[in-house]
Amino acid sequence: MWERSRYVGAVAASGFAIIAAACGGGGSSVASETPAQVLAAAVSATKGATSYEISGTGSFSGGISSFDLKVVGTSISGSFVTSGAAIQLVELADNIYIKAPASFYTAAGASSAGAALLAAAWVEIPAGSSYSSDFSSLSNFSDVSSQLADAGTVTSDGTGTVNGQSVVFIKDTGGTVLAVASSGTAYPVQVKETGTTAGTYDLSNWNSIPTVTAPPNPLQLPSS
């Protein structure tokens, strides 16, 4: 259901490949709908959303233990923790900006002086550069509706409460469980995965995230 592995698998691909309730207005209850109808309602709701926040914790590949990202259209801002290093991130107009501690850059092979220089500022990875392709999996988080639409066959997994929100649970054949708001707009509230890439994603703040802006005065990596 949720192609998280494509995203986190790109995180440590190279020195700069860092990648790295539900609330809403009207809408009818999905509490009495079939699992397929619940999924369709969640896909429709996410397609109509202008922004949202997604956060996660778990044992992710690339050493990632947590992330918190705000998505506005195709733009993303937020942070993640990988191998103990907290990284700030902005993606805007296909440009990637990161701010990381010196330890992150020295682990990637930078000299102490170079790492200190990079850590003191935001670093811009220009669109079309050889480094930017390492961040292509970020699109997974700016297109939740497509991720949900790939769920395939789903079955009912009961009802409950997640983050104070009444939800309906549905489960795909791989064991991933999706919690969908059972009243109001059928926004996804949480995704839980099991197995080797086990993790939990919370989705919230639908249609209420401010516009993403570029950080000031970034250092720019070469375009090649």
Tell where the protein language model's regions lie, with residue ranges.
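Sec-dependent N-terminal signal peptides
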Residues: 6-16
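C-terminal motif of bacterial Sec signal peptides marking the signal peptidase cleavage site
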Residues: 19-22
